[in-house]
């Protein structure tokens, strides 16, 4: 019996399968088990795992079996998680029970790299290795993880989730230590760049899994790499500076519509307001994130789904180029910054701006706004030559950076006028109708509400106080001039928003008028931060002349359209005469041939005055009960005054667009909607065939510019009253123009003699507005002006009237508004050619 037992034991041992030398290979050869079908799993029934199973057969539904390895459960699942976090020697000494669990993914040495990083953190080796070596280790690890995780299968992805969470946590610990060590080893405000370093996380789907993209700074520039998403919000880190055009190629690689998942930003604790000049009357810059909230996202400014660019490196060279464009194209028109101070900081490379470091969030917001505004004024050819990128791509990036910078500057809680200056620049930037800007893109209440926000913030900071009150509080001349310029620019865009939405302005006529006399007609080089006494105004053309023209006209525009003091035609005519006298006094010594800015100021001012004279006869009406402005008086039959004044405005706008001296300012010139609609309506009812024949080519050109802009922007032309009125007038005038010999079919010309004859007779007893204006007529130019307007200007038939990058400014024509001389809703401030 013992021998039988021994023999049986020997047979049992011989029947046992031999232990495989490679357990992993044996597990791989094992067939994939069949699990409960989909219906039984959802209904929580026991499945017999037939094909089809009995439950599905009895229910009469299709059976969908599931074939995959079983997921570890209970203590086995905990064992897999523990194995991923234990040291390598512990993993190699795994127990026999662990061998029965699901096999861990082959990390290809990933655990070794994790352990190395963990040891660096624990032993504080970062201070010994230096920032460069630590960054290289981090870059190597990220590249390894990216290579290892890309071909992950559905099963390995589940197991890798545990590893990725642990890895993400340790990388964040490592980066925090690197950041802390950098602050300890490097003096304040003089840190050395980290090379390379993670810049920003981005969410993006990849291979059915939830992965993230991140922008990594490498010696070759910014690169987008894949990495598993961290479980918590990631703090953006500052990155080294770039120069040249390296940033553009990498910024546009990612999808602009990937939804962001991590928006929290960690601000460096040492970004505080340094000493020096508090140029904005600020009481100190607090942490905008801790004291406020993400105001812009709530207000709809950051309404795109693109990720944040706030942590991307500062491109000094690109910023310098765009600042030069701003100083040339924008600063002469929107005069809210001190030109020499801005040039020293962004062009010459000064470390501070008016005593504030370039790391200050308010200064960053101003830089982003300057670049965004400047990029808008460039043509497509200029963008390609300077940055090798399209204008739309540059504008998309610059707009996003501007919005994020304003958000992080704490717009709603700021006490710094620099942030408000940046916000105003953001609001006045016009861009393509169908693409990216705020003012021209959003024709609803969005910009209208944001303008109201800007006005409230300015009032909350006391920037609207009268100059006498500021003097009593010890306000310097420098502070006063910048404050008044900002306030009057806000008054300007407030008037524009009122026209756009057919509402009353928020700023009263008195609040706007009291500040105008205190703005000096001087150059920015005449004063600086240390100027102790006021500087007297000049008689000649200065940096502020054109801005003063717009300030004075917008004050008159409030009286014309919203004030109760101009209810009669005589009062309105008197006000128009006063405005003309004030404006042309500023241009008394302006030589249009001296510079492009002088040429533009001269002709643009005349265009503004023509719009004022037209608005004298056609006041703006909100269409609300109790409006201040009465309907226009009935006109005599055959009166062509409206048509004359509308044509003067249209012709002057065409002249500015056609002459090469207006290239840098074309972003500012828009289609005068009031003049265009009035001219079309008057031609439809005018009986003077000769006048209509001379006027119609100008009307066709102006209307075609608007139409071509809509086509170039790939947006449908709104079929509103203006379109119907234009088609109706064309049909009516077609036989009349042919009989009158207008030659419209042969060329789109306007004879200069005819153009000169488009001046209505001067009323008897009229007082000349300015000695430079021949015979006292506002429409007649001097010999000097005439030479500037036609000396180098080819005839109309040789001009290409295609509107290049100049957007049409004006709210869309709304249903129910008839564009006639009796009832017209201008929707824009045609006093200023609508450039707010």
From Swiss-Prot:
Please name every pair of cysteines joined by a disulfide bond in this record: none
GO BP annotations, alphabetical order: DNA-templated transcription
Coarsely, its chief localization is nucleus
Gene encoding this chain?
Answer: vrtR2
Cellular localisation: Nucleus
Q: Name one Pfam family in it.
A: Zn_clus
Q: How is it used?
A: Viridicatumtoxin and its derivative, viridicatumtoxin B, exhibit anti-methicillin-resistant Staphylococcus aureus (anti-MRSA) activity. Moreover, viridicatumtoxin and a C2 acetyl analog, spirohexaline, have been demonstrated to inhibit bacterial undecaprenyl diphosphate synthase, a potential new target for antibiotic development.
Any GO CC annotation of this UniProt entry:
nucleus
Name under which the protein is recorded:
Transcription factor vrtR2
SMART domains the UniProt entry points to: Fungal_trans (SM00906), GAL4 (SM00066)
**CDD domains from the xrefs?**
fungal_TF_MHR (cd12148), GAL4 (cd00067)
Which superkingdom? Eukaryota
Q: Which residues form the signal peptide?
A: none
- UniProt-listed SUPFAM superfamilies: Zn2/Cys6 DNA-binding domain
Say what the protein does.
Probable transcription factor that regulates expression of the gene cluster that mediates the biosynthesis of viridicatumtoxin, a tetracycline-like fungal meroterpenoid with a unique, fused spirobicyclic ring system.
Q: Which keywords appear in this protein's UniProt record, sorted alphabetically?
A: DNA-binding, Metal-binding, Nucleus, Transcription, Transcription regulation, Zinc
Region (Disordered), start-end ranges:
1-29, 72-114
List compositional bias (Polar residues) regions by residue number: 1-26, 79-88
Q: Which residues bind DNA?
A: 37-63
Q: Which GO terms describe its molecular function?
A: DNA binding; DNA-binding transcription factor activity, RNA polymerase II-specific; zinc ion binding
């Amino acid at each position: 019996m013992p021998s039988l037992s021994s023999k049986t034991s020997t047979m049992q041992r011989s029947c046992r399968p031999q232990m495989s030398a490679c357990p992993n290979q044996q597990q791989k050869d094992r067939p994939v088990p069949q699990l409960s079908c989909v219906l039984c799993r959802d209904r929580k029934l026991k499945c017999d795992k037939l094909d089809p199973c009995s439950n599905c057969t009895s229910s009469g539904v299709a059976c969908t079996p599931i074939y995959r390895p079983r997921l570890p459960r209970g203590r086995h699942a905990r064992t897999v998680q523990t194995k991923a976090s234990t040291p390598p020697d512990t993993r190699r000494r795994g127990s026999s029970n662990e061998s029965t669990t699901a096999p861990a993914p082959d990390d290809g040495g990933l655990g070794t790299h994790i352990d190395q990083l963990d040891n660096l953190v624990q032993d504080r080796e970062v201070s010994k290795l230096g920032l460069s070596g630590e960054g290289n280790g981090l870059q190597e690890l990220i590249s390894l993880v990216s290579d290892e995780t890309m071909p992950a299968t559905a099963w390995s992805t589940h197991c890798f989730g545990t590893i990725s969470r642990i890895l993400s946590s340790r990388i964040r610990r490592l980066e925090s230590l690197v950041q802390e060590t950098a602050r300890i080893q490097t003096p304040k405000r003089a840190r050395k760049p980290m090379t390379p370093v993670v810049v920003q996380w981005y969410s993006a789907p990849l291979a059915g899994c939830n992965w993230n993209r991140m922008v990594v700074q490498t010696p070759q520039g910014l690169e987008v790499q894949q990495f598993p998403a961290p479980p918590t919000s990631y703090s953006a880190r500052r990155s080294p500076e770039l120069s040249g055009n390296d940033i553009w190629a990498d910024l546009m690689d990612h999808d602009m519509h990937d939804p962001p998942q991590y928006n929290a930003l960690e601000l460096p604790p040492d970004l505080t307001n340094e000493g020096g000049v508090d140029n904005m009357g600020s009481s100190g810059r607090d942490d905008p994130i801790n004291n406020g909230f993400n105001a812009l996202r709530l207000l709809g400014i950051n309404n795109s789904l693109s990720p944040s660019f706030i942590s991307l490196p500062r491109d000094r060279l690109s910023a310098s180029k765009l600042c030069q464009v701003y100083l040339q194209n924008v600063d002469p028109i929107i005069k809210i910054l001190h030109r020499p101070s801005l040039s020293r900081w962004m062009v010459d490379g000064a470390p501070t701006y008016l005593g504030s470091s370039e790391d200050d969030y308010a200064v960053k917001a101003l830089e982003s706004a300057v670049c965004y505004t400047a990029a808008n004024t460039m043509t497509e050819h200029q963008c390609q030559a300077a940055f090798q990128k399209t204008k739309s791509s540059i504008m998309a990036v610059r707009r996003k950076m501007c919005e994020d910078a304003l958000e992080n500057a704490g717009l709603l809680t700021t006490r710094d006028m620099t942030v408000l200056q940046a916000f105003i620049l953001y609001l006045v930037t016009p861009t393509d109708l169908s693409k990216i800007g705020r003012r021209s893109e959003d024709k609803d209440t969005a910009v209208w509400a944001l303008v109201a926000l800007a006005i409230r913030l300015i009032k909350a900071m006391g920037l609207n106080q009268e100059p006498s009150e500021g003097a009593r509080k010890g306000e310097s001349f420098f502070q006063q001039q910048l404050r008044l310029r900002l306030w009057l620019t806000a008054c300007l865009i407030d008037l524009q928003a009122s026209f756009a939405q057919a509402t009353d302005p928020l700023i009263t006529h008195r609040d706007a008028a009291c500040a105008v006399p205190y703005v000096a007609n001087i150059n920015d080089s005449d004063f600086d931060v240390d100027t102790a006494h006021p500087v007297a105004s000049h008689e000649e053309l200065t940096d502020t002349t054109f801005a003063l023209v717009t300030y004075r006209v917008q004050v008159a525009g409030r009286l014309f359209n919203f004030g109760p003091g101009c209810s009669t035609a005589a009062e309105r005519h008197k006000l128009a005469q006063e405005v003309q006298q004030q404006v042309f006094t500023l241009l008394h010594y302006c030589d249009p041939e001296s510079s492009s800015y002088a040429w533009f100021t001269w002709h643009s001012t005349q265009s503004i005055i023509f719009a004022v004279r037209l608005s004298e006869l056609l006041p703006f009406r909100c269409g609300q009960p109790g409006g201040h402005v009465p309907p226009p008086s009935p006109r005599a039959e055959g009166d062509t005054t409206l048509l004359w004044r509308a044509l003067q405005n249209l012709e002057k706008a065409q002249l500015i667009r056609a002459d090469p001296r207006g290239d840098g300012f074309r972003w500012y010139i828009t289609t005068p909607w009031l003049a265009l609609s009035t001219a079309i309506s008057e031609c439809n009812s005018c009986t003077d065939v000769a006048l209509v024949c001379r006027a119609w080519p100008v009307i066709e050109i102006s209307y075609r510019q608007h139409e071509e802009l809509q086509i170039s922007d790939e947006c449908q032309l709104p079929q509103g009253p203006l379109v119907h009125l234009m088609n109706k007038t064309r049909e009516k005038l077609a036989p009349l123009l042919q009989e009158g010999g207008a030659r419209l079919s042969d060329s789109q010309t306007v004879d200069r003699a005819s153009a000169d004859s488009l001046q209505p007779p001067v009323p008897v007893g009229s007082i000349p507005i300015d000695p430079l204006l021949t015979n006292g007529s506002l429409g007649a130019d001097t010999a000097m002006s005439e030479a500037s307007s036609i000396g180098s200007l080819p005839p109309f038939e040789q001009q290409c009237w295609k509107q290049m990058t100049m957007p049409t400014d004006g709210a869309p024509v709304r249903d129910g508004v008839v564009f006639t001389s009796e009832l017209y809703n201008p929707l824009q401030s045609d006093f200023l050619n609508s450039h707010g």
